[in-house]
Amino acid sequence: MIFRHDGDNDFTDLFCGLGGSTRGLIEAGLRPRLVMNHDPIQVATHRLNHPDCEHLVEDINAFDKRSLPRTRILWGSPICTEISPAGGRKRTRGQIALLDQDGQPIEGDAQPEFQRTRATALDIIAATEVHRYDAVLCENVPEFFLDWELFDWWLGGFKILGYNHQIVCASSAHLGDGDNETAPQHRNRGYVVFTREGIPLPDLEVRPAAECPGCGPVRARQVWRNPRRRKMGSWGVQYDYRCPTDSCGLILEPTTRPIGDVIDWSAAGQRIGDGRPDRKKFTPYATSTRERVAAGLARFGHEPHVTMLRRNTTAVSVAGPVPAVSAQGKHHALIVPNGRKGAVRTTLEPLTTVACKPHHSLVRPAPEVDDCTLRMLSPRELASAQRFPADYILPAASQEAQILGVGNAVSVNAARWLGERVKAVLA
């Protein structure tokens, strides 16, 4: 598909990585002028996909912001590895409680400070002070908005520079409309859009398509369970979607894309009873992995399912609507987080968050665990879960570099959703 862009609406993409944000903004009709990242592998791959803009391999902390070009828009996603729930860390003092989709506190090993997060966030202010962009767009994990003690001070810095701001939180599975397909992945992220005084704030109301049993097809409204707290968190825990009809107001599940749509069902897996294929001599799968596969068999019979070897959530049933899942598609999957606890989901649902390490494995069931086949989802499948197009070039260096780039990327549909709305107020 060819996307037409307005030559006047150009943008700079700091921390561009593999290019999810760049691709999304291009789809929104914006033009990239310069992109930057510290990782030469990701920048080289970005250049292959987007050859018509300038590429820099630089550490933004040490880069003279005066050397950046003057563009109308700046996109910046501050480094979030210190605070991402995928890294697993204990919460810091002074925060608002954040729960996972099961309502359980996010816990893990403590990380001492927000050092890199703070530094890269301040780089965005520094660039804005020099170039006075018409709009600045930032994306990060909810913890950036909830846990960082300087977050309100950071917002205040933009206010001093003459900017208004608007914050929105949503899952990548719920952002999209028209030909902007949603991502088949539950990826909760916060976004903040700054516009210069005199430029209207964009309409960032999240209104995903849903089916109301009484009212039919609707655009659901995002409703926060505790409106007195900062509107940031996870769907089904901190907020819901309701029917917009005043006389109805039912809690609805947005229409989503199933992960089964992007799985290569022709790729063969390894029989579990034959042991792990990544070992030279026979090594059985861990007991916890076998137990998760058995749980999937018990819940979903003999349909294919995906095991997610990562974080803790609780079991999700395919029998009816439950928080953080949706039901559509032709296949089933078991998705179980890596760690102490696991959860089961189906390919009727979107994938959970794609991280920077391989966590998702496809299981083809059989009557016994040993006879099931298992394989990790490929980088291409994970890229599709981030809504990259099928022909998007991935790093050639290694599978690890591919997964790193995909896991760090902004979901393409989310960047496009924001870009379209910002473009509307800059017209």
PLM feature spans:
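Conserved active-site and SAM-binding loop architecture
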Residues: 1-427
